[in-house]
Amino acid sequence: PLTQADDRILRAADDLSAVAEWGLPLADRINDWVYQSMTYRYEVTGVRTTAAAALELGAGVCQDYAHVMLALCRACGLPSRYVSGHLLGQGGTHAWVEVILPTNDGSGDAIAHAFDPTHASRGGLGYVTVAVGADYSDVAPTSGTYVSGARGRLTATKRVSLVAVE
């Protein structure tokens, strides 16, 4: 799997768990750690790059940041999932992580808390979820084949409208 923890990730998970309380404090710490440990660079990784490989490289794009955070969260016992969608104001798709934690109100319910390790922030307004899964391979935004002449071109557009939710 793309988020399998190697020895380096397991050591980092142990270190992070030792200094932060399980739950949101630990997820916040992991989010910040990934942001500080990686440099955003295009074309140094691909869709099959593992979390371990991206961390070893110390660089990648949003899906790599998300994979590293997922590997760390899971190694720390934090249930988490990969989110693919859009961040309003950015041109392309974006990836972030949701950590699923109990509500602590005794109901047995849980809530997904969004974390964006690419920007060292919590998700919120402006994050539009398209799909969730274990990692990128579960939620690839497109699949298929396009064949054309030498001058062919494939373009895509997106439009997002916000509506009131009651």
Question: Where in the sequence are the language-model features?
Answer:
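Hydrophobic/aromatic-rich core segments of domains that either
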Residues: 32, 64-151
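Secondary-structure boundary elements
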Residues: 1-60, 136, 148-166
